[in-house]
Amino acid sequence: MQEKIELNQEVAKPLAEKHTPMMQQYLRIKADHPDTLLFYRMGDFYELFHDDAEKAARLLDITLTARGSSNGVPIRMAGIPFHSADQYLAKLVKLGESVAICEQIGDPAASKGPVERKVVRIVTPGTLTDASLLPDKSDTFLMAVHQQTTRRGVSKTGLAWLNLASGELRLMECEAAQLAREFERIRPAELLYADGIDLPAVACARTRLPEWHFDQDAGTRRLLEQLGVASLEPFGCAGLGAAIGAAGALLNYAATTQGQSLRHVRDIKVERESEFVGLDSATRRNLELTETLRGGESPTLFSLLDTCATAMGSRALRHWLHHPLRDPALPRARQQAIGVLIDHGIDDLRSALRKLADVERITSRLALLSARPRDLSSLRDTLRALPHVRACLQAEPDSSLLSLTVAELAVPQACLDLLISAVAEEPATVVRDGGVIARGYDAELDELRDISENCGQFLVDLESRERTRTGIANLRVEYNRVHGFYIEVTNGQADKVPDDYRRRQTLKNAERYITPELKAFEDKALSAQDRALAREKQLYDVLLQALLPHIGELQRVAGALARLDVLASLAERAQTLDWSCPERVGDNVIDIVQGRHPVVEGQLAAESVPFIANDCQLNEARKLLLITGPNMGGKSTFMRQTALIVLLACVGAYVPARRAVIGPVDRIFTRIGAADDLAGGRSTFMVEMTEAAAILHHATPASLVLMDEIGRGTSTFDGLALAWAIARHLLSHNRSHTLFATHYFELTQLPQEFPQAANVHLSAVEHGDGIVFLHAVQDGPASQSYGLQVAQLAGVPQPVIRAARKHLAWLEQQSADATPTPQLDLFAPPPHPDTSDDDEPVSIGKPVQVALLPEQAAVLDALSDLDPDSLTPRAALDALYRLKVLAGEVVDAA
């Protein structure tokens, strides 16, 4: 980037001589920001020129014009009003663009050439702080990633990410293979990286920086300077060289975009993989934590739980859901606090919380000196309300977490006193409109306001006094734009004019005068409003500086309020939805009684339909449940609800179950549903196998694994064999808690070989030609899949259903009448003495090519007509039966 800037500057030099002074200034500034759109302030507009203008016109749907010329070329330009710039910035940032804001910092009246201008900040997708640009209920992260190779040749990948709107900075190191999972967890809005790094796909803006920006030693110095400490050891950063290098690049970039230091970044939190329950991108997507499978915001677990009264509470809840904890200590403390809130009532507390402002983001804008007047008044009103919030908790000392929260909600009194004395009760939106500083805070400002506001009364009083003093009854004190203030006396009264009157204007029938007092008032009055606004701006800037020492206290208050809001929201949800407190134990067990899927139950409740609750028991003697049953029967719902109950327990919430006992959990894996990865060039089956491979490589005895219809994307025999082998591996090697849904009824034989496996099914009953799903989990395998009935429910035409029913009856009859053909038992051990390892193939002799009989050709034709990737499990079974019939005909013909 630096080379590009220097090149642009060199190009600009010879061109500058042929451009107007204003365009020369623009080109110099643009050369410093070649990769961003430049908003160039001209009066009441931000103008864009040349390529920037064309791009902005296209992206923002604004008018592109050409006015005049520079260097003989028409100047393409587009503009937006400065007072509505935020809405255009929001659109550009959403599209992944960055914008440099260039303001007029000189006085136009005093400028001989172009007004002095300067880029005051750069708005990028990852460095947003303005309320109008930020989503209320989610955080925006700037992330830097750096890969470092140690002297021993070990490659380390360091991550640093910053929420500029809160000042929260986090570091971690991971393996390069885990980057995709971390990107999905953190979801950065902008990613900083150097050349040569191999990055997985990530849906965010990318900014490439020179390698030297990520230097570890420079990063260490930058962090020490930022935190004001002599060592990073107390922060747990020892050995995190790659992450420290990333943090240095990130902090320098963020400070550059803001045009100032980051005063609110005062701490580092180091995250480690062992801290959280592992959730890969497939699991987060399949469980629909904060986004539906179709990309919507609702219905999700977050949308169900988010009854938070404040935006900072909603953001904290989102963070909790994506960061379930392995250590049960903090989740237990949260659940204890929720129980106390339920017992003591939460209505008053939630009512108090609803009146509070977003202290977290206001504090960040204070630190960056960009807080607006109504930010300050909202902050003042929130601090005033803290004693009432604390009073709602004073009677609830039974929770250590609530006690800590009460302590952290102590009012920063000096900050509050300053805001009360300095800020008007109802300030204007922006300082330039005036009325921001409270009356009585500054004597000079009060005087200027009095002059401006009481001008009319002063003139009335002066006129009355002068009539009395001079004896001129018809004397008038007036004002016009040309001559300003004056005293008018008719010619007939001219002999009574005092000596201190100075003639200002002569009219036909009157004379106009000015006095020293009126002249002094005129000087004040004519400039009072401008001077008042200037004084108010000066006082406001001083006020922002005076609030900086209170940033730490305000961050403490914001964190406590967000935590309290989440706990109150979870308490309300538990109470309203009849959830229970889970029991966390050390045994490797998942025992759920009458569990429900929280989101599905909520959707059904809206339609007054009851949800059928089910039990789930997994332990050392019962590690894998083979789940069979009809499509639409509820298999996937049962699996997902189990995972969500476990996740909620690890978050520290209550759970949708009558009772839940949850042991240690290190990861949750899901292999549910699939679709082609067109961008990655992967078929449905390839996506399925990739996810299955990740599970088989990483699942442990403390993991929860959900497998839904594995093997369906290939031929029936291949899929069946893979499904059996995967289930067997999970039982014998991973030994994870596993829910394994399948339509391969042959798999229901697995418990005969592995006692730790058990069959359960989702029940259904036929009613006439239709089917009634009972959604109840029962022991044992299902008897059939009810594929035709489900097809009928889906609206398949009746002629097709009738034809399928007849063909099914024929297939079943043919299958019953066919002579059994000798074949290898799929589940029989290989004909070798050692059956403990599946690596060796079973040798069944070399194939010999022979002439085909017509019956054999029919088998090949049937096989060639099959499209394995498009077969449903039921269709695959139908094809299998058909092939079996054809194989019988081959045997008969032989």
From Swiss-Prot:
Residues holding ATP: 629-636
Protein's recorded name: DNA mismatch repair protein MutS
UniProt GO BP: mismatch repair
Keyword DNA-binding among UniProt keywords: yes
GO CC annotation: cytosol
InterPro entries per UniProt: DNA_mismatch_repair_MutS (IPR005748), DNA_mismatch_repair_MutS-lik_N (IPR007695), DNA_mismatch_repair_MutS/MSH (IPR017261), DNA_mismatch_repair_MutS_C (IPR000432), DNA_mismatch_repair_MutS_clamp (IPR007861), DNA_mismatch_repair_MutS_core (IPR007696), DNA_mismatch_repair_MutS_N (IPR016151), DNA_mismatch_repair_MutS_sf (IPR036187)
Record organism: Cupriavidus pinatubonensis (strain JMP 134 / LMG 1197) (Cupriavidus necator (strain JMP 134))
Keywords of the record: ATP-binding, DNA damage, DNA repair, DNA-binding, Nucleotide-binding
Function text: This protein is involved in the repair of mismatches in DNA. It is possible that it carries out the mismatch recognition step. This protein has a weak ATPase activity.
Sequence similarity: Belongs to the DNA mismatch repair MutS family.
Disulfide bond positions: none
Coiled coil: none
Residues covered by region (Disordered): 819-840
SUPFAM superfamilies referenced in this protein's UniProt entry, alphabetically: DNA repair protein MutS, domain I (SSF55271), DNA repair protein MutS, domain II (SSF53150), DNA repair protein MutS, domain III (SSF48334), P-loop containing nucleoside triphosphate hydrolases (SSF52540)
GO MF annotation terms: ATP binding; ATP-dependent DNA damage sensor activity; damaged DNA binding; mismatched DNA binding
Nucleotide-binding listed as a keyword: yes
